[in-house]
UniProtKB/Swiss-Prot annotation:
Positions that bind Zn(2+) 2: 1352, 1357, 1375, 1378
Keyword terms of this UniProt record: Acetylation, Cytoplasm, DNA replication, DNA-binding, DNA-directed DNA polymerase, Metal-binding, Nucleotidyltransferase, Nucleus, Phosphoprotein, Transferase, Zinc, Zinc-finger
Family: Belongs to the DNA polymerase type-B family.
Region of interest: Disordered: 20-39, 105-135, 261-297
Sites of N6-acetyllysine modification: 230
Annotated protein name in UniProt: DNA polymerase alpha catalytic subunit
Keyword tRNA-binding: no
Species: Mus musculus (Mouse)
First-level EC class: transferase
Catalytic activity reported: DNA(n) + a 2'-deoxyribonucleoside 5'-triphosphate = DNA(n+1) + diphosphate
Residues found modified as Phosphoserine: 192, 215
Gene: Pola1
GO CC, alphabetical: alpha DNA polymerase:primase complex; chromatin; cytosol; nuclear envelope; nuclear matrix; nucleolus; nucleoplasm; nucleus
């Protein structure tokens, strides 16, 4: 029986009966009779009257209920589970479930167990413990009690600070005392997070051995460093042996408040995580919970369909693979002997971080250090201090008078430069201390008037002094280089550190205060103390893959985190094959929305299944638990999907919103102020995790593979070849109705984390990123973010530093360029930015030969130059250091930019330049690695390592050319890029001429490849011919090589960059097989629905087959009729109708959002919560009939909406007419017997709407919905000739295609400034010249129209003539040459009208302003559009409008149209 005390107190029976529990009456422990309100008042009345009150002792029946131990434990448990304070979520008030007499039991236990303290101390402790933190009841009883005398109240406690303890309580670094089976005696006092008191733990109490202390989990090796006692010792107790993690979780709330009185700074003992035996290999497979449908619940039938067949929790786990806990003494550095026998600190650096504003001149290096005593690696942080700014002053030849702006005749010496810096510059910029010396440096970049080799004054001073202006000039010096070079760059370059590697720190210093969350912290007082250790393999890393589920709060529309799951591998090797399985431990934590409750049996279900699930009462508790686990596990790499642009941002925002302490545990650097979140580059989110690298598999997949979208479901299907079920966001709330549903939700999150980890392993993301980083010499965390431009930049930086060159300073671009400074990938994502950049870098690209369109059924040879542009750079020694660029004066004198000045090729006798040398190194190293791969009996791990290395070398070498032509690159050199492409065009034309001289027909060529029609059906002869051409071409070059890329058995060549072919693949037995290859066709683009793609694939397969023409036409006809019927009767799955289109910018940044279907749907998705789509993401949508008369573009819906809304149905006519018909019609153009009318008839469409004609829309217009009337302005005028006008001041050609440049806050009028950054003259100052140029362009277009050239629609004919033929067909004049097809105008009336509309559009400022938001409109009007500027715009617009008024194209004369009908009436 449980012990029951006979207290000398009187309890009212009614109080017991009302509450059903003694707990209801124990808020105040007053020894007063409570037999009834009336009797109490009567006694009070008598007492006031002066009557003597006699105490009567009555024989009372026992008010205690006698129960056995098991019943009492259940009662205590039930009270703990009860949320007895409404909406309190257990924070601040905690019900521990015990009776009022349990405190006395605990007092006795404390008296008997306490050691080293006298009784007084215990009594004092007991007094503190017995103060329950409860609120005063608002009733008459409270008034009576208050009247008896003033009670001493508890000191007010700041709950936000108390919640800080909740985070620490979750930190599993702290050992707990041994606990025994129930009854659980817990001190009754205020808790920080009462939610964790609920025993929704993964294990049941019977799993804990009763009465026996748990064996400590330690490695077999003895610990050489003494283990300091834990914080529990401060409370006067001996540290207990370590408990397994399972037991720690059960006892997670068993700490005293005193355990946390010690400062965090003194916590120097950390351990590696011990994984609980969540998957017990000795346990039989857990039986799944069966789910029965409840017809009364609307969502049950839907949820039932997604219940898992196999539970992911039933996986066995090998205990031997799980790392054991280790303890380290951070004050005792693991030093080893260096090369010169001195004690050094050796570590493998992984990530680096600098804070130039708060800690200038300091670089933090994060990595792993080997602990010999326990044979493992743990995290460390090395703080490198005193990295000085390094500037180079270029002296003038003659002194310069800054006042007059003229050069004097006084020669300049280096002493003069020094004195000017010492007396003027240092005083002005408060540089109190500096060092200087004379050095000789080389320069080879784009600033004119800088000599190739010269003496410079090198000046070094503390980085704590602000940097000097980038454009600083003086009387004795003309340029200053290195003003804005970062401390991190200086450190990496000067110490020759190329990517993650082993480093040694001489004379390492301990830090007084902890600066990081790492196990060891070291300080290097100067960068020279850090040196590279070569040729040592990397250590294994701790990798954590996590996934989380969010819900949108319906009130504030913020994303709230409800569950998280993580998988961890504690020894993930970077130089071997991925481990199998790719994780060793896992954990899962779940909370609930504020308006939901957990299922009543949820705790029992997870206990029964023996799962490791932590239940958190609030989101704050959940996040605190996650941060504590991250701190405990200490991962080196966090892996996720869409983690950079959504999950990490949401996590940090919720940390901020919930005021969770120690937010910086998400990274490794201790910080108090969270960086600014929400920037488009994700800069703040990346900085928050410094020290822990972020691997976003979405970013990695975009670089390594091609998919129609990069959503997790698509990646799982493409890479892992399995299906991922998606839980709609709106169904998550309903999953809290039953344990089985909630369990499935957690399993879904767990599986997502596993999918993410598997994708990372399948793509070899980490080993590849490491190899690329070691080649380029940048930072691995940036490589994982996909910055190709930055990789090239660092590779060249290392090369030029090593060769004593001054490198270009980083340019701070104004407006959109600032955003591109960190993220070069946006070149692909934002077309507007890309176009703006290219205005300053316009040069001719690769040559594309005109295709001889048609179907070829003889063998076609495809010859391809290997790595054309890198090979050209090597072949002709094209480099910054070898090519003499034309002077700026010559460039300004060039009026026609299209006839750009191509620099001369360098002298063949010149020494090889740095750029070709670096490319050659990469090529040669790749060849060596490929040779090593051919060795016999290689270890599979070594083969994989070699393969990853050669792939990294190839990726790096092929991207080297890009830095020359990318206008935001630090090494941007337009003349060099133009020279490379010029030589590429020249080589392709020369190769074409050579092949034609061999009496062979070249039918197509594109940049680095040509197609040759062999007119042969003998494969052996074809290869002989190919080898002959190959040898003839290769004779001309030393390094350039052309090779046979493919042989096509048949080829359907439609237009430039568009063809389909059957590729021949020889087999070992002398025969061959064929494989279909598609290039540029609609069916390989993602903005066509799968139904159209599948139909197009079938048609192509038929055309390329060996069947007769009649059979092909018949098969196509049958298939199209079948498809038309299936679409109309609704037997086609909805997924076949989904159209995918990529966002080129964030959805909210589009000015005309309604007319763009993917933008409209993206905004809806973002409003729903669960995920966030942004620039670069792909949006799926379907076109539906919704009962409205809106255009197709405005009837686009997300697939989820189609499933939910009953009034939506697939728009079958749209898909047949606008998706399937155009795709099939384009493919069948060269095929006799099939035309657009027949295709329409077969699909069940109205054939009168179609006529035989050539589709001349560009590939971008192909994907648009509903025709020209529904196009946006950008898409409507995409093919128009851009308006160009030379700047009278600088001669730069300005290109205008819109009223505004830039977007968002960076928007400004296109006429506001010249595209030449150095030109200060605005185009608004020469409006007369601009108007005259516009009139001349319009007249030229009109003349072109009236020239009246006609061309034949037949692709194989293409005749061009001006004389109108006499023979006409129903569709127009017949071509007199081929007599098959009709003639069409080369420059149609529609083209002329569209061009005139475009000229009006680019100067219609009033219309453009109306499309903006009110805020943007007011800002632009105030800043850029005074009345005078608006009038200038209107004048130019009126010119185009005047010419348009003369055109009759847009007008319909109704009187003429209905003249016949009017006469009849």
């Amino acid at each position: 029986m449980a012990p029951m005390h006979e207290e000398d107190c009187k309890l009212e029976a009614s109080a017991v009966s009302d509450s059903g529990s003694f707990a209801a009456s124990r808020a105040r422990r007053e020894k007063k009779s409570k037999k009834g309100r009336q009797e109490a008042l009567e006694r009070l009345k008598k007492a006031k009257a002066g009557e003597k009150y006699k105490y009567e002792v009555e024989d009372l029946t026992s008010v205690y209920e006698e129960v056995d131990e098991e019943q009492y434990s259940k009662l205590v448990q039930a009270r703990q589970d009860d949320d007895w304070i409404v909406d309190d979520d257990g924070i601040g008030y905690v019900e521990d479930g015990r009776e009022i007499f349990d405190d006395d039991l605990e007092d006795d236990a404390l008296d008997t167990c306490g050691k080293g303290s006298d009784g007084k101390a215990h009594r004092k402790d007991r007094k503190d413990v017995k103060k329950p933190s409860v609120t005063k009841p608002n009733n008459i009883k409270a008034m009576f009690i208050a009247s008896a005398g003033k009670k001493t109240t508890d000191k007010a406690v700041d709950l936000s600070k108390d919640d800080l303890l909740g985070d620490i309580l979750q930190d599993l670094n702290t050992e707990t005392a041994q606990i025994t089976p129930p009854p659980v005696l817990i001190p009754k006092k205020k808790r920080s997070t009462g939610a964790l008191l609920n025993p929704f733990s993964v294990h049941t109490p019977k799993a804990i051995p009763s009465g026996k202390p748990a064996s400590p989990v330690l490695r077999n090796e003895p610990l050489l460093t003494p283990i300091p006692l834990k914080r529990a010792e401060l409370a006067g107790e001996l540290a207990q042996p370590e408990c397994p993690e399972d037991e720690q979780e059960l006892g997670v709330m068993e700490f005293e408040d005193g355990d946390f009185d010690e400062s965090m700074d003194t916590e120097k003992v950390d351990e590696k995580p011990v994984t609980a035996k969540t998957w017990d290999q000795e346990t039989e497979p857990v039986e799944r919970v069966e789910h029965e449908a409840d017809p009364e619940r609307g969502t049950t039938s839907y949820l039932e369909n997604f219940l898992p067949d196999v539970s992911c929790w039933d996986i066995d786990q090998d205990d031997e693979s799980i790392p054991q806990e280790v303890q380290v003494d951070s004050s005792n550095l693991p030093l080893v002997k260096g090369a010169d026998d001195e004690q050094v600190f050796q570590f493998y650096w992984l990530d680096a971080y600098e804070d130039p504003y708060n800690q200038p001149g300091v670089v933090f290096l994060f990595g792993k250090v080997w602990i010999e005593s326990v044979k493992t690696h743990v995290s460390c942080c090395v703080m490198v201090k005193n990295i000085e700014r390094t500037l180079y002053f270029l002296p003038r030849e003659m002194k310069f008078d800054l006042n007059t702006g003229k050069e004097t005749a006084i020669p300049v010496t280096m002493k003069d430069v020094y004195e000017e810096f010492d007396s003027k510059i240092s005083a002005k910029y408060k540089i109190m201390k500096f060092k200087s010396k004379i050095v000789e440096k080389n320069y080879a970049f784009e600033i004119p008037d800088v000599p190739e080799k010269s003496e410079y004054l090198e000046v070094r001073y503390s980085a704590e002094v602000p940097q000097l202006p980038q454009n600083l000039k003086g009387e004795t010096f003309s340029h200053v280089f290195g003003t804005n070079t970062s401390s991190l760059e200086l450190f990496l370059m000067n110490r020759k550190i190329k990517g993650p590697c082993w480093l040694e720190v001489k004379n390492p210093q301990l830090l007084n205060q902890p600066i990081s969350w790492c196990k060891f912290e070291v300080m290097a007082l100067k960068p020279d103390l850090v040196n590279v250790i070569k040729d040592v393999s990397p250590p294994p890393l701790v990798v954590m893959s996590f996934s989380m589920k969010t819900m949108q709060n319906v009130q504030n529309h913020q994303h709230e985190i409800i569950a998280m799951a993580a998988l961890v591998h504690h020894s993930f090797a970077l130089d071997k094959a991925p481990p199998e399985p790719p994780f060793q431990t896992h954990f899962c934590v779940v909370s609930k929305p504020k308006d939901c409750i957990f299922p009543c049996d949820f705790k029992e279900v997870i206990s029964k299944k023996n799962m490791k699930v932590e239940i958190a009462a609030t989101e704050r508790t959940l996040i605190g638990f996650f941060l504590a686990k991250v701190h405990k596990i200490d991962p080196d790499i966090l892996v996720g999907h869409n983690i950079c642009s959504f999950e990490l941002e949401v996590l940090l925002q919720r940390i901020n919103e919930c005021k969770v302490p120690y937010w910086s545990k998400i990274g490794r650097l201790r910080r108090s102020n969270m960086p600014k979140l929400g920037s488009r580059s994700g800069f703040g989110e990346r900085n928050a995790t410094c020290g822990r690298m972020i691997c976003d598999v979405e970013i990695s997949a975009k670089e390594l593979i091609h998919c129609k979208s990069y959503h997790l479901s698509e990646l799982v299907q493409q890479i892992l070849k399995t299906e991922r079920i998606v839980i709609p966001t709106e169904n998550i709330r309903n999953m809290y109705s039953e344990s089985s549903y909630l369990l499935y939700l957690l399993e879904h999150i767990w599986k997502d984390a596993r999918f993410i980890l598997q994708i990372m392993c399948e793509l070899n993301v980490l080993p590849l990123a490491l190899q690329i980083t070691n080649i380029a010499g940048n930072i691995m965390s940036r490589t994982l973010m996909g910055g190709r431009s930055e990789r090239n930049e660092f590779l060249l930086l290392h090369a030029f530093y090593e060769n004593n060159y001054i490198v270009p300073d980083k340019q701070i671009f104004r407006k959109p360029q600032q955003k591109l400074g960190d993220e070069d990938e946006e070149i692909d994502g934002d077309t507007n930015k890309y176009k703006k950049g290219r205005k300053k870098a316009t040069y001719a690209g690769g040559l594309v030969l005109d295709p001889k369109v048609g179907f070829y059924d003889k063998f076609i040879l495809l010859l391809d130059f290997n790595s054309l542009y890198p090979s050209i750079i090597q072949e002709f020694n094209i480099c910054f250091t070898t090519v003499q660029r034309v002077t700026s004066e010559v460039q300004k004198a060039t009026e026609d930019e299209e006839q750009e000045q191509i620099p001369e090729l360098p002298d063949p006798n010149l020494e090889m330049g740095i750029l070709p040398r670096e490319i050659r190194k990469l090529v040669e190293r790749r060849k060596q690695v490929k040779q090593l791969m051919k060795q016999q009996d290689l270890n599979p791990d070594l083969v994989l390592q070699y393969d990853i290395r050669q792939k990294a070398l190839k990726l790096t070498a092929n991207s080297m050319y890009g830095c020359l032509g990318f206008s935001y690159s630090r090494f941007y050199a337009k003349p060099l890029a133009a020279l490379v492409t010029y030589k590429g065009r020249e080589i392709l034309m020369h190769t074409k001429d050579m092949v034609q001289k061999m009496n062979l027909e070249v039918i197509y060529g594109d940049t680095d490849s040509i197609m040759i029609n062999t007119n042969s059906t003998n494969l052996e002869e074809v290869f002989k011919l190919g080898n002959k051409v190959k040898s003839e071409v290769n004779k001309l070059y030393k390094l350039l090589e052309i090779d046979i890329d493919a042989v096509f058995k048949s080829l359907l060549l439609l237009k430039k960059k568009k063809y389909a072919a059957l590729v021949v693949e020889p087999t070992s037995d002398g025969n061959y097989i064929t494989k279909q290859e598609l290039k540029g066709l609609d069916i390989v683009r993602r903005d066509w629905c799968d139904l159209a793609k599948d139909t197009g694939n079938f048609v192509i397969g038929q055309i390329l087959s060996d069947q007769s023409r009649d059979t092909i036409v018949e098969n196509i006809q049958k298939r199209l009729i079948e498809i038309g019927e299936n679409v109309l009767n609704g037997s086609v799955p909805v997924s076949q109708f989904e159209i995918n289109k990529a966002l080129t910018k964030d959805p909210q940044d589009y000015p005309d959002r309604k007319s763009l279907p993917h933008v409209h749907v993206a905004l809806w998705i973002n409003s729903q919560g669960g995920r966030k789509v942004k620039a670069g993401d792909t949006v799926s949508y379907v076109i539906c009939q919704d009962g409205s008369n809106l255009t197709a573009t405005q009837r686009a819906y997300a697939p989820e909406q189609l499933q939910k809304l009953d009034n939506l149905a697939i728009d079958t006519q749209y898909y047949l007419a606008q998706q399937i018909h155009p795709v099939v019609a384009r493919i069948c153009e060269p095929i006799d017997g099939i035309d657009a009318v027949l295709i329409a008839l077969w699909l069940g469409l109205d054939s009168t709407q179609f006529r035989v004609h050539q589709y001349h829309k560009d590939e971008e217009n192909d994907a648009l919905l509903g025709g020209p009337a529904q196009l946006t302005d950008e898409e409507k005028y995409k093919d128009c000739e851009k308006f160009k006008c030379l700047c009278p001041s600088c001669g730069t050609e300005n290109i205008y295609d819109n009223v505004f440049e830039g977007s968002g806050l960076d928007m400004e009028p296109s006429l506001y400034r010249c595209s030449n950054v150095d030109c200060k003259v605005s185009p608004l100052t020469f409006m007369v010249q601009l108007s005259n140029k516009l009139i001349m362009d319009i007249r030229r277009c009109i003349k072109k129209y009236y020239d009246g050239w006609l061309i034949c629609e037949e692709p194989t004919c293409c005749s061009r003539l001006r004389r109108l033929p006499l023979h006409f067909s129903r569709n127009g004049p017949l071509c007199p040459v081929c007599m098959k097809a009709v003639l069409r105008p080369e420059y149609s009336d529609k083209s002329l009208y569209t061009q005139l509309c475009f000229y009006r559009y680019i100067f219609d400022a009033d219309c453009a302003l109306e499309k903006l938001t009110e805020h943007e409109k007011d800002k632009l009007k105030k800043q850029f559009f005074p009345l005078r500027v608006l009038q200038d715009y209107r004048k130019v617009k009126n010119i185009a409008e005047q010419f348009l008024s003369w055109s009759g194209y847009s007008e319909v004369n109704l009187s003429k149209l209905f003249a016949n009908y009017a006469g009849k009436s």
